UniProtKB/Swiss-Prot annotation:
Known function: Plays a pivotal role in the control of morphogenesis of shoot organs by negatively regulating the expression of boundary-specific genes such as CUC genes, probably through the induction of miRNA (e.g. miR164). Participates in ovule development. Promotes light-regulated transcription of CHS, CAB, HYH and HY5. Positively regulates photomorphogenesis (e.g. hypocotyl elongation inhibition and cotyledon opening in response to blue light).
Domain TCP: from-to ranges: 42-100
UniProt name for this protein: Transcription factor TCP2
The organism of origin for this protein: Arabidopsis thaliana
Subunit structure: Interacts with SPL. Interacts with CRY1.
Length: 365
């Protein structure tokens, strides 16, 4: 078809004026051109043309086969622009185009209307650009507000972190102080035992005699009385009948601080004496002034059988009642040369129902 058109074109030297008049409608009808303002932005900045089906792009996309034929025709015609080759094709097909139905029923705007449309288009484009600018400004304001809120959140988070750090530091300091106080109190057994006795009362009377130094100033302490306690023993009875050695007694309490037993009124008057047998370590005896009526004595001794003879200590009793009954306690430790044995100190009560004469007979040597 393209070859036939070219042959016909070569045969005809002059083009009819009527054909030129028909083509002039397309060449000089500027009212159908829609120009796009550059302010609107985007890639599609070239003008469009108004057709019966609305504005259309001036650029045409061709298929692969049509594009090959078209560019071959353009090269054969010697045109440097594709639009000139399209114009030549339209002129060559004028007869066939005239046979097609007309578009008289289609209303196209005149030049005045086109100018008005261009003005409206420009105004619309300007309004779009202003709205875009305003939206950008609003977005920037919103972003600034968000940034402010983020900064406030960060400040609050930092403040909370500082508070947590200060709290943890305070707790660590408190724990360190408590540990230091515990060490200091452990270095002073008299004060620690005083605090322990004052803060930890118990129904068992022997809990107050777990240390050799309980009360160092002759203070009077009231303890609960338990008369229904059952006597128990962890060491055989022959230990009590073993002959005692001579001991030297040392008092931990000055004599002028020891109040008379009769003025206690049933309260405990604690006196501590250290007995030092020859090569047998040390023993401390504590006697109560009264208040217990079901116990004879308690003895803390080692399980090592070869040291029983040299370990028994002298008991000292301070009767406060007419019957002279009251608990007596004995504490002792093995010599240093026998420390390789499995030392386990045990405390026992026995003979809780003995009379006062037996107490007096066994309490003194």
């Amino acid at each position: 078809m393209i070859g036939d058109l070219m042959k016909n074109n070569n045969n005809g030297d002059v083009v009819d004026n009527e054909v030129n008049n028909r083509l002039s409608r397309w060449h000089h009808n500027s009212s159908r051109i829609i120009r796009v303002s550059r302010a609107s932005g985007g890639k599609d900045r070239h003008s469009k043309v108004l057709t019966s089906k609305g504005p259309r792009d001036r650029r045409v996309r061709l298929s692969v086969s049509t594009a090959l034929q078209f560019y071959d025709l353009q090269d054969r015609l010697g045109y440097d622009q594709p639009s000139k080759a399209v114009e030549w094709l339209i002129k060559a097909a004028e007869d066939s185009i005239s046979e097609l139905p007309s578009l008289n029923n289609t209303h196209f705007p005149t030049d005045d209307e086109n100018h008005q449309n261009q003005t409206l288009t420009t105004v619309a484009a300007n309004s779009l650009s202003k709205s875009a600018c305003s939206s950008n400004s609003d977005t920037s304001k919103n972003s600034s507000g968000l940034s402010l809120s983020r900064s406030e959140l960060r400040d609050k988070a930092r403040e909370r972190a500082r508070e947590r750090t200060a709290k943890e530091t305070k707790e660590r300091d408190h724990n360190h102080t408590s540990f230091t106080d515990l060490l200091n109190s452990g270095s002073d057994p008299v004060n620690s035992n005083r605090q322990w006795m004052a803060s930890a009362p118990s129904s068992s009377p022997m809990e107050y005699f777990s240390s050799g130094l309980i009360l160092g100033s002759g203070q009077q302490t009231h303890f609960p009385i338990s008369t229904n306690s059952h006597p128990f023993s962890s060491i055989s009875d022959h230990h009590h009948h073993h002959p005692h050695h001579q001991h030297q007694e040392f008092s931990f309490v000055p004599d002028h601080l020891i109040s008379p037993a009769e003025s206690n009124g049933g309260a405990f008057n604690l006196d501590f004496n250290m007995s030092t047998p020859s090569g047998a370590g040390a023993a401390v005896s504590a006697a109560s002034g009264g208040g217990f009526s079901g116990f004879n004595r308690g003895t803390l001794q080692s399980n090592s059988t070869n040291q029983h003879q040299s370990f028994l200590a002298n008991l000292q009793r301070f009767p406060t009642s007419e019957s002279g009954g009251g608990p007596q306690f004995l504490f002792g430790a093995l010599p240093a040369e026998n420390h390789h044995h499995n030392h386990q100190f045990q405390l026992y009560y026995e003979n809780g129902c003995r009379n006062s004469s037996e107490h007096k007979g066994k309490g003194k040597n």
